[in-house]
């Protein structure tokens, strides 16, 4: 095709072919989303039509179908993918006439690939798509849905239902929390970057809070969709805190009685992209601004018995353990580990504060921080994830840090911060993308959910929540058969238990420390040799309890 003809074709919408240096239209003024060969025919998919060409003169047109993909399995019989409407088979009955052969097959799965924020509650996983860019420069313009997984099936609170009930189209969800009211009804709150705060009671849209019915404000007095809310978090008393960007009072609180409160925080008022609220174990509230401008900072808010008055402390700069200045351009996420240390994600890597109470002092402008330093294969020390954009940090029950990045996948740091336990990316794992949005952990099972821009995966983690006693300890698989050569999981332990495995004569075979309430044994002794067939005793104790046999494991070699 000549360049002039090619240029002409590319300016048009439709289907064209060239004959004798002449461009001939087959379908005009219709945008085509996909084209593919099916059998010996050409299928062209528009927004609500499909054209199936036998040749340049003969084609069938199927109307009122939004087909994402098509494949043939017999002459004039096709499988069609209709997105959320499922998978169907159709057959040709005549010119432009098709009929469905089967009911739509709808696969059980998430409503959206985007897993912007995830929360685990009551052995259910709640996911929202979203939201806004890491720097807050723009929103993703995604319809708001809440996807819920109960380990058997998926359900979804669709945006159309919210539109019908609340007369507001939900979009750009940013954070989600789940609780129960006094009558044990499930309550879901979802914040939005422009549309306020949404409330669902027992999976039904109940309310949308914005400037018309609450103290929530629109950015800089703008009308329309500028009620920018984020950072949902419950404090120790059950009050719901949230950030409200670009307004006169940046912190809003919906107390457990349903009354609203507004807090004026000088370092946050009027600022762009106020992100998360981390409620620490001592009920302080850590708040980050992620936009890479002079506004980027961390703020700690403390309040005693009042939700209408608080003291705040702002800081931006750090001095690391090598006495170097550490001043990132933006603060992206926060977490508290089991030692009470505060971890902070930035555009230059992750740091942690071993004495976070110093942040609530007047002299906090150059806080001391620790940057994780590891040793490479050549014996040379290096800063862990130096100059890497950190998107999320989650701490498991073994005090290991799951760190998500913007393009490098997930890293798991050991309890003592001296070793990379796991490194997951699209090259070595089922991760669907290396651009990680969110990480959440089911504390009861240890399962880790990793959300990205392209979908959700889960990993059977080794750390679970510790039990109060040893009354329900068990191991699986048990017995361990010859074909099973991976790991044996011992679960139901108390936190940080010392676990010993012995033979029936009391000889020590293996010893480890539990990760929260769970320990792993690879059926090998201390020399790395797989143990002989037999029954092995599992003994466990904490620093405050007496050692006892908690379960047995049968190994068949």
Regions found by a protein language model. Name each.
Residues 1-13:
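Single conserved hydrophobic/aromatic residue that forms the stacking wall/gate
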Residues 110-118, 168-178, 220-233, 271-276, ...:
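Signature of short aromatic-glycine-proline-rich micro-motifs recurring in repeat-based ectodomains
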Residues 127-144, 195-198, 249, 290-299, ...:
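Short, conserved, GDST-rich strand-edge loop motifs in beta-rich repeat architectures
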Residues 509-531, 542-546:
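Glycine-centered tight-turn motifs at strand-turn-strand junctions
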């Amino acid at each position: 095709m000549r360049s002039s003809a090619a240029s002409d074709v590319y300016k048009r919408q439709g289907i064209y072919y060239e004959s004798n240096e002449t461009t001939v239209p087959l379908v005009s003024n219709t945008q085509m989303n996909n084209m593919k060969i099916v059998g010996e025919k050409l299928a062209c998919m528009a927004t609500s039509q499909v054209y199936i060409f036998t040749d340049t003169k003969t084609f069938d047109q199927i109307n009122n179908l939004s087909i994402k993909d098509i494949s043939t399995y017999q002459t004039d019989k096709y499988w069609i993918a209709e997105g959320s409407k499922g998978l169907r088979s159709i057959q040709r009955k005549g010119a432009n006439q098709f009929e469905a052969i089967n009911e739509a097959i709808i696969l059980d799965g998430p409503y959206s690939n985007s897993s912007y924020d995830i929360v685990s509650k009551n052995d259910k996983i709640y996911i929202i798509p979203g939201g806004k860019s890491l720097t807050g420069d723009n929103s993703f313009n995604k319809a708001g849905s809440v996807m819920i997984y109960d380990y058997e099936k998926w359900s979804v609170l669709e945006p159309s239902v919210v539109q019908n009930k609340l007369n507001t189209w939900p979009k750009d969800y940013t954070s989600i929390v789940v609780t129960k009211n006094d009558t044990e009804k499930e309550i879901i709150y979802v914040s939005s970057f422009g549309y306020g705060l949404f409330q669902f009671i027992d999976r039904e849209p109940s309310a949308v809070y914005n400037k018309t019915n609450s103290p929530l404000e629109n950015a800089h007095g703008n009308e329309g969709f500028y009620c920018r809310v984020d950072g949902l978090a419950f404090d120790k008393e059950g009050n719901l805190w949230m950030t409200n960007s670009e307004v006169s009072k940046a912190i809003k609180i919906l107390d457990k009685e349903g009354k609203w409160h507004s807090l004026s925080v000088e370092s946050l008022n009027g600022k762009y992209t106020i992100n998360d609220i981390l409620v620490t174990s001592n009920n302080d509230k850590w708040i980050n601004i992620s936009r890479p401008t002079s506004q980027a900072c961390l703020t700690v808010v403390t309040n005693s018995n009042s939700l209408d008055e608080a003291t705040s402390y702002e800081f931006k700069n750090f001095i690391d353990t090598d006495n170097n200045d550490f001043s990132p351009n933006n603060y992206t996420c926060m977490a508290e580990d089991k030692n009470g240390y505060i971890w902070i994600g930035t555009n230059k890597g992750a740091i942690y504060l071993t004495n976070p109470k110093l942040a609530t002092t007047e002299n906090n402008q150059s806080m001391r921080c620790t940057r994780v330093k590891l040793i490479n294969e050549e014996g040379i020390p290096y800063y862990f994830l130096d100059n890497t954009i950190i998107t999320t940090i989650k701490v498991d029950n073994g005090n290991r840090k799951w760190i998500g990045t913007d393009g490098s996948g997930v890293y798991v740091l050991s309890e003592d911060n001296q070793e990379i336990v796991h490194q997951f990316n699209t090259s070595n794992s089922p991760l669907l993308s290396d651009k990680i949005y969110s990480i959440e952990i089911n504390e009861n099972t240890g399962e880790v959910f990793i959300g990205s821009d392209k979908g959700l995966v889960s990993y059977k983690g080794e750390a679970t929540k510790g039990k109060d006693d040893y009354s329900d300890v068990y191991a699986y698989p048990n017995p361990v058969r010859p074909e099973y050569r991976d790991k044996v999981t011992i679960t139901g332990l108390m936190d940080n238990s010392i676990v010993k495995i012995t033979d029936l004569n009391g000889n020590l075979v293996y010893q480890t420390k539990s990760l929260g309430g769970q320990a792993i044994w690879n059926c090998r002794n201390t020399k790395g040799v797989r143990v002989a067939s037999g029954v092995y005793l599992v003994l466990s104790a904490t620093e405050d309890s007496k050692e006892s046999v908690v379960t047995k494991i049968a190994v068949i070699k």
